[in-house]
């Protein structure tokens, strides 16, 4: 299993009430199955531990890779292209690590994934950014089968167009690390027509973080350096870059319902930056990761 994938999984592991609320897990582009096996064998932190026994689906179009997925009774192997409907159920959590970049039409793929999820289900994406600046030089890499370059801003656009809640969301893109990690909920807003949907339309839909809205209304487009999002470790992060003198937007403190503790208190925390310097500020620190959990399934 990739180290960064395990790190994200272990961060999710800390949220017991959220894990209790899940029943069906779908891994889109599962490869040889390390990640879906983690889900299939996950146990509670009780003493003694109790298996969650999630209903797991491993989706991949490569039969050779699927053959390496462990034969566990709660993993159903599905040899299908994830660009079409792949599973006969609605997911409570959809996991897509290192896979979306292989879609030739990622906007349509995200729409198809949305259709296979319950409202308030979570989509967890980890996807590499194949261009950027390193050592003061622009670089670009193109791998076989990858026709699109993803950025944090383009992902927010694609996800919100497809009805994913990018207001009550979690994102991390670290400096000098190509991986973009984002966890979003499926909202009750239907996917929109990507050809005609503007940023202003998405503002009206209520699916955007306040720092995203501020950037769009100030410049007419979204600037990466303006974005501030929490991550699963309960810290708040700028995306990839932050200037030496940082002012935290007052609007970053918004009264959302996306955390377990709905009675959040303003707490002192450290805003993570690309460089070792940090800024002490008072902002609303995420207490939990998830919305109040759904009732347990029978």
What do these predicted ranges mean?
Residues 125-148:
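Short, glycine-/aromatic-enriched active-site segment of Class I SAM-dependent methyltransferases
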Residues 265-266, 270:
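Low-complexity, polybasic segments enriched for Lys interleaved with small residues
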Residues 92-104:
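A short SAM/SAH-binding and catalytic strip from SAM-dependent methyltransferases
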Residues 1-89, 93, 110, 148, ...:
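Conserved N-terminal segment of class I S-adenosyl-L-methionine
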Residues 147-162:
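Short alpha-helix
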Residues 164-175:
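Conserved S-adenosyl-L-methionine
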Residues 177-182:
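Short hydrophobic/aromatic beta-strand or adjacent loop that forms the aromatic wall/cage
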